[in-house]
Amino acid sequence: MSQVIQGAVEEPVYSNKSLTNENDSFLSLIESFSQERGVPIDINPKIGRKPILLYELYKKVIKRGGYDAVSATEDGWTNIAEEFNQSDPARSAGILQNVYFKYLISWEIHDHWHLLLPPPSTLELSENRQNVLERVKVFNSCSPPKPTNPITIIDNDKTHSFKKFYKSLVKEDEENGIEKKINEAMNSSASQPLPNSTNFASTTFPSVPFHPLPVDSGLQKYIDRNSNLTPPALGAGVPGPPLLVRVALALKSQQDKEVDWAIGHLIKISFERHQEFKLERLPSLAECLVYSLGFQVTKAKQVSDLTDISLCMDRAIGIALVLRNSVLSVENAKHVAQTKLVISVLEASIRCAKTFNNLEFLHYCLDISEMISSYLHVEDEKNVFYLALCEFLNSSDYSILIATLRTLARLALNDRNNRLLQDLKSNVIANIIALVETDNEEIVAAALDFLYQYTTYRTNTSNLLASQEAWMLVDQLIRLMMYQAQERFMTVTIENSESNPAVKHEATSSISLPMEELQQLVAMREPERSVKWMRCCFEPSSDDYVLQTDIWQLYCSDMERAQGPNVMGISPADFIKVSSHAFYNARAMTVSTPQLPVEYVINGIKRRKFPTSVNGMRYQPCRWCLDSGKECGELLLGTPLLHSHLQEMHIFPQILETGKCRWSDCKYEIQRLTPASELSHYQLLSHIVTHLHDDSLETLVEGRKLSPSREFRIPLLLTAVDDQGDATGIALTATLVLRNLVRSKQGKMLFSAIESRVLEVSSLNPAVAPYVSEMLLGQI
């Protein structure tokens, strides 16, 4: 196929008038067109088992305005799929769109829109299928204009002369007089020989054979290829930096358009992909955000035009929103808290929000302060950030109060110098106490968290108890110890056997641990030491219990014997808690006894008759009666050591001669008719061994005994607990605040007034019973 490339094309190149059938003609044109572009085509595509006529598909899409118009409509391709009678139009719509884009989109651009086609790699073979027409128009606008006098190349197979070839390179109307002379010279040179042909040939035209250039020659392809080339844009094809790096650089530039662009992207990323938004991956981004926030706040204070102030505040709000979204993650909160100038920038932002009365900006700043306050260290009560927060304690807005109270409580928790929360006015504390009476759970929890940190200082506690609001606070704390309590029932089984005596708590006057075992326990750390000590001195028993005060006093006496007084490594409340770790069924609870209406006990354990070692071996006392009538009483670890002790210290030949057993109150005596012999000695020694306890020989000979029993359901009011059964939530915080008040100088007087009410609460709510036990132990 030969063509003449001219400035304008009057009729479509791909036309075939010999074809009468429209569909066949269209398929022939499309197939020829695709071969020219070098793109494979399937002229009979199918969706499922139903064939799709490309001609019908093309007409329907063009009728609706083209590919982009159909794709912009929500159900555009679905409606076309319905017209093709597809069983599942919604599913077939995507397949139909894919068929059109692969086989017909280039024909639409060429035939319908009459635009220059880009390469197949950027059109039908591209993954980008949006705004196709706009991208092609941009491609056409970037192409260089065609020259006014294009070179015309004519395919001529009849002549090979230089004259014909030269005429094919120029227009006929451009020949002038000089060209005519050249033509005449060329005509005459054909009939006359050349003088000095060797030198003349080297100075005139070279004797190179010339051949006609067909249309599909290399020169024609080079001209076609270079006619569409455009100079590459600056930076085209170079992979730029990551998005977050560009955002950080845009923030550093402090140019308004760049900052607006960066803020827009960061707001979207921090909201939609907050789980992947890690500031540690780009360390400079957190610093840029904090610095940009301070820059916009400072700029808003310096400008005077209302429009400029509004623009600066909008940018500051956007940056604060990004920081607020990011610090919801613990890792990001730690990273932002370690950023320089974050405290001063937050203080300036809070005061700026108050100055311009911008509540949205203020809430974002307070949220940021709340989330990072756990990792901040404010060690001076004159810190401007701390003082700015204290100004909000008189606010009537609950949302501002909640954020402020939580932030101050967390700052006080990290206060190493004990300087914070000690310069607050009495009216501020009275307002916070009044918040405890509200029905808002969030404000009550925030107020209790603040009061817990506030009452850890003794001076604050003394001032609080001396105020008029003290008893109102105590009443509310006792009420909140049962906050949202739910009724539960505990089943207790009591055996109804007459042979068994009534269950009593174990006395604490049994044999104490030897000093060598205490030395091993002292080398351990709490709470492992307490757990090991309980297992050495007590054993599980579902029918017994031990008073909490007795077991604590016994532990204190053993530790004082081993390491001296006032060196306890665990508090009474924590000691009571670890009982459940030492024994699975041990529970701290309250019971009624004939002596007292309420007794704090540990149910499910009893005192061992003889203690065991840390490794679990049982100690046994030597009960051999001496000549003075007293028992030896030495503790020995295990039966073999006790047997060796008897042989070495007590069983002498004189004892064997008497034939009497002197073990405690044993009356055994060998009956012999003859003088003492080895047989009588053996009988006495065999009898003495029966007094020695051997764990390995213990067996159950009577089997299980069934006895009638009674079950009692004890009603309880249980508040919120965690997975391990420990108290949590408002009830726990209220109990801890009350415990701090009881520990003060006026604590005994306060506890004596509320003791009955607190004991009643602890008997109904076992979750707070360990903390009430600590209050009781503190009064001893």
Curated annotation (Swiss-Prot):
This is Chromatin structure-remodeling complex subunit rsc9. SUPFAM superfamilies: ARID-like (SSF46774), ARM repeat (SSF48371). The keyword Phosphoprotein applies. The modification Phosphothreonine is found at T230. It comes from Schizosaccharomyces pombe (strain 972 / ATCC 24843). Its main location: cytoplasm. Component of the RSC complex composed of at least arp9, arp42, rsc1, rsc4, rsc7, rsc9, rsc58, sfh1, snf21, ssr1, ssr2, ssr3 and ssr4. The complex interacts with histone and histone variant components of centromeric chromatin. Belongs to the RSC9 family. Pfam families: ARID (PF01388).
